[in-house]
Every structure is written in C-alpha cells, then in structure tokens.
Amino acid sequence: MANVTVVGAQWGDEGKGKLVDWLSHRADVVARFQGGHNAGHTLVVGENVYKLSLLPSGVVRGKLSVIGNGVVVDPWAFVAEVDRIAQQGVVITPDVVKISETATLILPIHRELDALRENRDDGEPIGTTRRGIGPAYEDKVGRRAVRVIDLADPAALKARVKDILHHHNALRRGLGHEEYSADQLVAELTEIAPKILPYAAPVWRVLKDAIKSDQKVLFEGAQGALLDVDHGTYPFVTSSNTVSGQASAGTGVGPRDVGYVLGIAKAYMTRVGEGPFPTELHDADGQMLGERGHEFGVVTGRKRRCGWFDAVITRQTLQVGGVHGVALTKLDVLDGFKTIKVCVAYEVDGERLDHLPAGKEAQAKATPVYEELQGWEGSTAGARSWADLPAEAVKYVRRIEELIECPIALVSTSPEREDVILMQDPFRS
C-alpha cells in the first residue's frame, strides 16, 4: 500500500499531528478530508512549535498539502492561519496548498448560529467550538451552501447568498436575532475572494495525478472516530464522518486509494466537551493524567477530561474504521503509576456488554469493568526501541494489543518527532 490514512480512534486529541508529521517526510502529498478549523494539532519540529487547525500538517515540511471537498473552510481563518505560520518561516503559496473548489465555506452567519444554539437556555449544549462547523455542514447537506468556486462568479455568489440567507434569516428571526444583510455578506466574501481563489483547484484531479505517478499520499483525519456523526457518541459528536471511509468521499479518490489505515489512540482516554465517557476519572489519578499529558485543547484551551484506557470502545472504533494498525501515543504519561486500569467490558442495567450501546441514555449508564495491570517505575520518555522500555510497559502495550484485536504498529513516547518505536511501517504494509 503506497498511501496511508491517519484517523483518530478515540475522541480526538490522540496525537495525530505528531504522527502525521513523522510520516509526512516520506509522503509526497498530505490531504485533509473532513472537519474544519475546530480541531487543532501541535507539531514540534526541532525547536519550533507549530499549531495548526485547518492547514494539513505537511505544510511545515513543504509538502503539497490538499484541503479536500469534505472539509468546511472558513476563509478568514484560513488567511489568518497562513499569515501566522508564514511568520514562523513556513513558505505557503498556491503551489504548496490546494483547496478543493467544491469545498463548503464557513460564513459569519454559521459562527453566529453556532453560538446562539450553544448559549440557549432551553437545550442541552453539545460542547461545540462555536466556529460554525455544524451549521456549515447543515447548509451543505441542505444544498444551499456557498462553495469556494462561487467566489469566482459575482452573479453566482449573489444568488447563493440570497438563497442561504432566505433560510438563515428565518432562523435568526425565530431566535430573536436581527437579520443578516445580503449586501454585507456579499461584500465580505468579495473582499476575501482574491485571497482564497489562487488556492482553489480540482483536488480530485491533483490527487489522481499524484497517485497515477506513484507519489505517496498521506490522508490526514481530524478529531476521532468517537466524534463521527454516524458512529460516535451521538448527539455529542462533530458534524462530519471522521472514519477512514471519509478519506475517499472527502477528497475524490477511490476507496482502494486510501491505502493503509493507521488508527491513533492514546495509552489512556481523554475527551473535550459534553457527552458520555465511561472511564472518566474524577480523582487524583485523573488529575495526574491531565497534568502530565498537558491535556488542554489546542483550539479552545479547554481542559480535557481524562480516564483509563477503554479497550471496548477503542476496539469498536477500530473495527468500524477498518484500521490496519494502531499508533499508541503518550505511553510516557503513564510512567510512575503503581496500578493501571483498562476497561474490558461495560455493565448497563446489570447486563455485561462487549460494545458501547447506541442510545444516548444507555451510554450514560455504562459502567466500566476494569482489569488491573501492574505499572512501572522506570521512564518510557524518549524510548525508540523495545529495549528502552520497562518490562511492565511492554506487557501493558501487548495486553492492549490483545484487547483491541488490532496490531500495535508503533508507539509514541514523547512529543518529539523522532521518539517513536516502530513495529510495522505503514508505507510498506
């Protein structure tokens, strides 16, 4: 398999950025296929720290970086991120970055609607980043979205704005909010258009040509499988499909071209925002995981909820996502724990389950059944071979591998790019 698809196997924040960066030096093209600028990732390259939200990780290495049609693009956020990364010495030009001409745009009305819904008093918040991702996807499915290509045609742009505001202004009136001016929105989009259009391209063809010429493509997922709109902990999910199948639909390549699917999973669990979390810890162990793992969101700065590794739910996401191998990250965060617990089943209303139930109410009742493993005193930080790991750490990794029923392809032992133990090369598998 010449290509590799990287997806999160938990609730996001698994360390995909580092692994994508680690793999990208061997890739020719890096492509994003879903989400927006709501999920951030941090790359540590030498002494430089890059924080990206929308741009594919390959940009920091000068790789051709593609934003696929499955991504919703905030044009103002894109320009701001390009400017910020450029100030760190990264060269970003239309030759390096391509945006799908059919990608949906996130507009100011989407951000405002997102915030209005999260702030309402009569409903349960989802815990969104309030960046307009969900409302933009709603308009895409509703066939009224403004897309990148519309910026190139003033007449078409006015028609699209009229159509989308017919819907949104009705919503705004119902929420007690003033209507948005069509002239204002057209003016805002017309102003930003020259900064976006040079990057617009038929990315399906760009990727087809790359694959045809035997270039290696790295498909970069955002968030995680447990936030997938179909397969996640609904309704506490994102608004797109995050599993590997979306790599095809979200870029325009065929399913056979997504290649080796690498699922990223932390050696423990974290979650940002609302929703069920069976193994969540509210004690000193949970606090220690958060402090050691620096568990704060890149985009929002929100503190992440922490818990023990959940083998049940991770096994489920790996199967749904067609994952070939797992990258286990942040093993070093578990250094020093005398006992480490792993969830091996759930109990719901007295019944033992080997999967997460589909219903929101049943998920909230799921109580973890734990298996206790011995911790280790030595350090795993910076380890690059099995010989560098304490014996109990090796046993932990092997037990996780058995429980999730999927090979551990590599282990990450620090934020540093090269601190990786490789067992199975995704590009050669």
UniProtKB/Swiss-Prot annotation:
<dbReference type="GO" id="GO:0005737">
    <property type="term" value="C:cytoplasm"/>
</dbReference>
<dbReference type="InterPro" id="IPR027417">
    <property type="entry name" value="P-loop_NTPase"/>
</dbReference>
<dbReference type="InterPro" id="IPR001114">
    <property type="entry name" value="Adenylosuccinate_synthetase"/>
</dbReference>
<dbReference type="GO" id="GO:0000287">
    <property type="term" value="F:magnesium ion binding"/>
</dbReference>
<protein>
    <recommendedName>
        <fullName>Adenylosuccinate synthetase</fullName>
        <ecNumber>6.3.4.4</ecNumber>
    </recommendedName>
</protein>
<dbReference type="GO" id="GO:0046040">
    <property type="term" value="P:IMP metabolic process"/>
</dbReference>
<keyword id="KW-0479">Metal-binding</keyword>
<feature type="binding site">
    <location>
        <begin position="40"/>
        <end position="42"/>
    </location>
    <ligand>
        <name>GTP</name>
    </ligand>
</feature>
<keyword id="KW-0460">Magnesium</keyword>
<comment type="pathway">
    <text>Purine metabolism; AMP biosynthesis via de novo pathway; AMP from IMP: step 1/2.</text>
</comment>
<feature type="binding site" description="in other chain">
    <location>
        <position position="129"/>
    </location>
    <ligand>
        <name>IMP</name>
    </ligand>
</feature>
<dbReference type="GO" id="GO:0004019">
    <property type="term" value="F:adenylosuccinate synthase activity"/>
</dbReference>
<feature type="binding site">
    <location>
        <position position="304"/>
    </location>
    <ligand>
        <name>GTP</name>
    </ligand>
</feature>
<dbReference type="Pfam" id="PF00709">
    <property type="entry name" value="Adenylsucc_synt"/>
</dbReference>
<dbReference type="GO" id="GO:0044208">
    <property type="term" value="P:'de novo' AMP biosynthetic process"/>
</dbReference>
<feature type="binding site">
    <location>
        <begin position="330"/>
        <end position="332"/>
    </location>
    <ligand>
        <name>GTP</name>
    </ligand>
</feature>
<feature type="binding site" description="in other chain">
    <location>
        <begin position="13"/>
        <end position="16"/>
    </location>
    <ligand>
        <name>IMP</name>
    </ligand>
</feature>
<keyword id="KW-0658">Purine biosynthesis</keyword>
<comment type="subunit">
    <text>Homodimer.</text>
</comment>
<keyword id="KW-0963">Cytoplasm</keyword>
<feature type="binding site" description="in other chain">
    <location>
        <position position="302"/>
    </location>
    <ligand>
        <name>IMP</name>
    </ligand>
</feature>
<comment type="similarity">
    <text>Belongs to the adenylosuccinate synthetase family.</text>
</comment>
<comment type="function">
    <text>Plays an important role in the de novo pathway of purine nucleotide biosynthesis. Catalyzes the first committed step in the biosynthesis of AMP from IMP.</text>
</comment>
<feature type="binding site" description="in other chain">
    <location>
        <begin position="38"/>
        <end position="41"/>
    </location>
    <ligand>
        <name>IMP</name>
    </ligand>
</feature>
<dbReference type="InterPro" id="IPR018220">
    <property type="entry name" value="Adenylosuccin_syn_GTP-bd"/>
</dbReference>
<feature type="active site" description="Proton donor">
    <location>
        <position position="41"/>
    </location>
</feature>
<feature type="active site" description="Proton acceptor">
    <location>
        <position position="13"/>
    </location>
</feature>
<feature type="binding site" description="in other chain">
    <location>
        <position position="238"/>
    </location>
    <ligand>
        <name>IMP</name>
    </ligand>
</feature>
<keyword id="KW-0436">Ligase</keyword>
<feature type="binding site">
    <location>
        <position position="13"/>
    </location>
    <ligand>
        <name>Mg(2+)</name>
    </ligand>
</feature>
<feature type="binding site">
    <location>
        <position position="40"/>
    </location>
    <ligand>
        <name>Mg(2+)</name>
    </ligand>
</feature>
<keyword id="KW-0547">Nucleotide-binding</keyword>
<feature type="binding site">
    <location>
        <position position="143"/>
    </location>
    <ligand>
        <name>IMP</name>
    </ligand>
</feature>
<feature type="binding site" description="in other chain">
    <location>
        <position position="223"/>
    </location>
    <ligand>
        <name>IMP</name>
    </ligand>
</feature>
<feature type="binding site">
    <location>
        <begin position="298"/>
        <end position="304"/>
    </location>
    <ligand>
        <name>substrate</name>
    </ligand>
</feature>
<dbReference type="InterPro" id="IPR042110">
    <property type="entry name" value="Adenylosuccinate_synth_dom2"/>
</dbReference>
<feature type="binding site">
    <location>
        <begin position="412"/>
        <end position="414"/>
    </location>
    <ligand>
        <name>GTP</name>
    </ligand>
</feature>
<dbReference type="InterPro" id="IPR033128">
    <property type="entry name" value="Adenylosuccin_syn_Lys_AS"/>
</dbReference>
<feature type="binding site">
    <location>
        <begin position="12"/>
        <end position="18"/>
    </location>
    <ligand>
        <name>GTP</name>
    </ligand>
</feature>
<dbReference type="GO" id="GO:0005525">
    <property type="term" value="F:GTP binding"/>
</dbReference>
<dbReference type="InterPro" id="IPR042111">
    <property type="entry name" value="Adenylosuccinate_synth_dom3"/>
</dbReference>
<dbReference type="InterPro" id="IPR042109">
    <property type="entry name" value="Adenylosuccinate_synth_dom1"/>
</dbReference>
